[in-house]
Amino acid sequence: MSEQNQTPDAELDVQEFNNEMTQRRAKLAELRTKGNPFPNDFRRDQISNELHAAFDDKSQDELAAEKHYVKIAGRIMTRRIMGKASFATLQDMGGKIQIYVTRDDLPEGFYNEQFKKWDLGDIVGVEGYMFRTNTGELSVHTTSIRLLTKALRPLPEKHKGLTDQEARCRQRYLDLIANEESRRTFQIRNQVMNGIRNFLNSKNFMEVETPMMQVIPGGASARPFVTHHNALDIDMYLRIAPELYLKRLVVGGFERVYEVNRNFRNEGISVRHNPEFTMLEFYMAYADYNDLMDLTEEMLRTLAQNIHGTTKIRYAKDGEEGIEIDFGQPFARMTMVESILKYGNDVKAEELTTLEGAIAVAKRHHVELMKSWELGHVITAIFEETAEHMLHQPTFITEYPAAVSPLARRNDDNPEVTDRFEFFIGGREIANGFSELNDAEDQAERFQAQVAQKEAGDDEAMFYDADFVTALEHGLPPTAGQGIGIDRLVMLFTNSHTIRDVILFPALRPSNK
């Protein structure tokens, strides 16, 4: 088959694919007779984007006069053989660059006996000098070329790429080879992670690591994964959040700490949820939730400017036309009840002051309720149904009910709510933060209430953590803490419609099931 028609397994007839594999293995066998087809002694000195940065503004005459020599390496993505000369496109971590190969520039017989037998997907090392073709394309005039890795399987077809999302996630390595957009997504993810660390480090935060396996899972309301430690002969849990350990560190005197790491929750998979996900959590002593909102606003504005060169980005949730999100304007702030009244249409404020009234509102809006719920639970469920999806521009929702905020400090003016916010963009929760509860007796009572909910059938209710209560009894300074979902943040900055597009290897059902 021709190189122009090479396609991945899903696109090929089984017999055609088998023939392709047979041909490539035969080529590999022949190459082995002439030396090692997998050498490891080639060292490049530049990558493609560096070449473009250095020479894109050079004219054909300037390049010819300078004759700048380079050593590059990459995967053959396209090739045009024209008798005694060929053009090929190499792809590396920086992008793509064209190479020009002629028979006369290579050792006798090499062009026909080796180079022309290489396939798309093979990885080569090239030495040569920069020049510009008559059509104006920056290229490397090859003076030496070596095969570094023989590919036995064909690349995804170049015009279609790897378009099936399931296949893209399952074979991410092929997705990264074939789709420039996917490579860009994960490059931006790296920028987000680095940007967050740089920002927090500049604010005198210290990065720490806390246990991934815990005897008592805490810090969030979620169903944990359970494992067993053979040496200790105890069940342990993959962490659902690092919060309680980070606050222990604040008790110990590390007054500004953060952690960027994985959390695990044994729950459903959706466009917004993956059971293994990346979370930033940070805590600062002598601060409250208002300080966190200010810090979050500054951090996200800085990230947007540094990554995209502007504080305005476009986000198209679920494949819609999209909206412009402006990080340059002050972020909106409203209470949970205010948001329900704004977006709930027929909801009256007095209805949200009693359990009976709130249940009536919930029924009108077809909100499913649990019998054990208090007023705060019902109000939160109404908010999630009526208002959450309407919060397109950056918005902080404050005054979360104490019933759904077991770790947050109660509001001084209204103890039924807490000094807590959740942050929304594009109709999705991005962050959760609050002034920390540092009253050990109040915390113990709330843990006991969570235990009662768990006994009533709520699998996501928290365990009682006696050691954490003990830590609070030693004194936690006034503290504020926050968690930001990195995956959802990357979805926003890359205009991705599903969380699977921003996680390199997301959870998938086995292909044989």
Swiss-Prot record:
Pfam families, A to Z: tRNA-synt_2 (PF00152), tRNA_anti-codon (PF01336)
Alphabetized UniProt keyword annotations: Aminoacyl-tRNA synthetase, ATP-binding, Cytoplasm, Ligase, Magnesium, Metal-binding, Nucleotide-binding, Protein biosynthesis
GO CC annotation: cytosol
Cofactors named for this entry: Mg(2+)
InterPro entries: Aa-tRNA-synt_II, aa-tRNA-synth_II, aa-tRNA-synth_II/BPL/LPL, Lys-tRNA-ligase_II, Lys-tRNA-ligase_II_bac/euk, Lys-tRNA-ligase_II_N, Lys-tRNA-synth_II_C, NA-bd_OB-fold
Chief site of localization: cytoplasm
Subcellular location per the Swiss-Prot or TrEMBL entry: Cytoplasm
One example of a Gene Ontology biological process annotation: lysyl-tRNA aminoacylation
Catalyses which reaction(s): tRNA(Lys) + L-lysine + ATP = L-lysyl-tRNA(Lys) + AMP + diphosphate
Residues reported in the UniProt entry to bind Mg(2+) 2: 429
Gene Ontology MF annotations: ATP binding; lysine-tRNA ligase activity; magnesium ion binding; tRNA binding
Protein EC: 6.1.1.6
Cofactor note: Binds 3 Mg(2+) ions per subunit.
Binding site for Mg(2+) 1: 422, 429
Subunit structure, interactors included: Homodimer.
Recorded family membership: Belongs to the class-II aminoacyl-tRNA synthetase family.
Protein name: Lysine--tRNA ligase
